[in-house]
Amino acid sequence: MSVLAYGVGLGFRAVGERHCVGARGNVCPLGAVVPGRSTGGRCAECARLDRAHSVAADTMADDPRTYRVYLAWFGPGMVKVGITGEERGAARLREQGAVVFSWLGRGPLMAARRTEEVLRADLGVPDRIPYAKKRAVRGQLPGPEERARAVAELYARAAALEGRGWPESLERLPLEVVDQMGIFGLDRAPESASAPESASVSESASGPVRAVRELVDGGVVAGRLVAAAGPDLHLAVAGGGVVVLDTRLITGWDLAAVPQVGQVGQVPQVGQGAQGAQGSPMSLVPHAIGSDVRVPLIDIGGGGVQGGLF
């Protein structure tokens, strides 16, 4: 297990069947096999147990912690409202791949939930956006001023609701636009695997065009990490272009290493490596790994399975 870094090759091969990862630190009692396309990686019983005491599932109404309400922007016309525990800071926004966000308020859990409902009802702001839609716009994001303006305008509309359904126990926080484009590596256009390391943004390949649909026994995913947003790793692959791997598809698989070729220089760290279901290393190693994708892929934006790639 190694640290992930932009510009570094990573790769693995899936082995055997995908098994349920269990729930809340407990092994799945059934040892159930789960579908390759499932992003949860759990059987129905373990999924139910995992959500049995969850803020997201509204089963923790008595949670005494302070919560924050946020406004998140993922692309043109793509905004949402959500809540997160104050002690977590912006971790939830990074997990969701929010390109830009601002805090709106802070207070008790139920006041935060009520604010979500008010924004949904009065402003039509959803509380969730499918990852597929987020991926579809990442290669075509506007500049920083337009991104910030979208969040500021939404904040102004939300703040205008004070006194009109806004819970009294929710303290409004000042507008502070946070842009995470650089953290995710999206400020640099993803380069193709064949592009020179010195290529400028204008010389680089366009945004990602394909995504991993599922892993399969013997399937290989390998490439050079160029961006990471939410659960998605953007990998430059041989022949040009970028493949997006939703890391939630990895859970429950045993993973084996793929051949390494050569060494690369030091690059900034972007996060911790991951492990397979049985703790096997994922071969996220700081070496140059040959680009190879041998799993079913789909066109980002709803296209069909790519022919000849599996």
Language model features: what each stretch is:
Residues 1-310:
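Non-catalytic accessory segments flanking enzymatic or RNA/DNA-binding domains
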